């Protein structure tokens, strides 16, 4: 079901899906709700979903089953009388994920606060604070190095900070730079992400992403320096 008000301030999408398999006869539905309200200064979203343990999507990929998830969002936009900044905004997004089959145990929580600005030359910049809680349901090595994994059943609460700047996208050459640092499970992380784009209209368009992560975990867990180069 799709919702749209006449003034376009309210819109939303709602669904209920059921999968039919011979093997499973229950816990095979998925339900999703998404309601949005938008004005010049204020926007908010109320959204969530339920995916049963036995739900099988034949039409697409489902990241996780057996969860209840809510992820509302609130954003307030400012319109300053400024020659450089067109708009800037404050945004808050909490995310909660529960496991119904485990007495609705909280498995993950994200709290995200963001400030962002759009400049008159089409460049953007901002800062983000992220806090995450997670419960591990299996042994997990966050460095992906096959080192000593964090043990199943352990819980972690960690916070990191991020800033970003994107140059004007209207230019032939543009870039986005995103440094970040903070806690990472039971250790620390420093990261930098650089995306470069170049185009010759209308014949050529290319980009490359370069990411570097420096992960430090306490003994006996592994450290890692991870470099990713991904041309597109």
Predicted regions and their residues:
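Hydrophobic, small-residue-rich alpha-helical packing segments that form membrane-like cores
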Residues: 2-6
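Exposed, low-structure sequence patches enriched in small/polar residues
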Residues: 7-232
């Amino acid at each position: 079901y799709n919702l749209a008000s006449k003034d376009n301030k309210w819109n939303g999408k709602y669904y209920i899906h059921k999968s039919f398999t011979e093997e499973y006869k229950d816990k095979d539905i998925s339900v999703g709700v998404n309601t949005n309200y938008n004005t010049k200064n204020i926007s908010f979203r109320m959204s969530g979903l339920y995916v049963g343990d036995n739900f099988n999507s034949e039409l697409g990929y489902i990241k996780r089953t057996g969860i209840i998830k809510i992820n509302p969002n609130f954003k307030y936009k400012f319109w300053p009388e400024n020659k450089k900044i067109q708009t800037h905004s404050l945004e808050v997004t909490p995310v909660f994920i529960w496991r119904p089959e485990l007495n609705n145990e909280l498995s993950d929580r994200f709290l995200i606060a963001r400030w962002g600005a759009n400049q008159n030359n089409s460049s953007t910049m901002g800062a983000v604070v992220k806090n995450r809680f997670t419960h591990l349901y299996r042994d997990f090595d966050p460095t992906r190095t096959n080192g000593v994994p964090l043990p199943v059943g352990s819980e972690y609460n960690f916070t990191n900070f991020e800033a970003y700047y994107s140059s004007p996208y209207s230019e032939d050459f543009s870039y986005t730079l995103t440094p970040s640092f903070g806690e990472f499970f039971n250790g620390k992380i420093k990261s930098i992400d650089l995306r470069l784009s170049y185009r010759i209209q209308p014949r050529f368009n290319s980009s490359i992403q370069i990411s570097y992560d420096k992960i430090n975990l306490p003994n006996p867990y592994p450290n890692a320096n991870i470099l990713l180069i991904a041309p597109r």
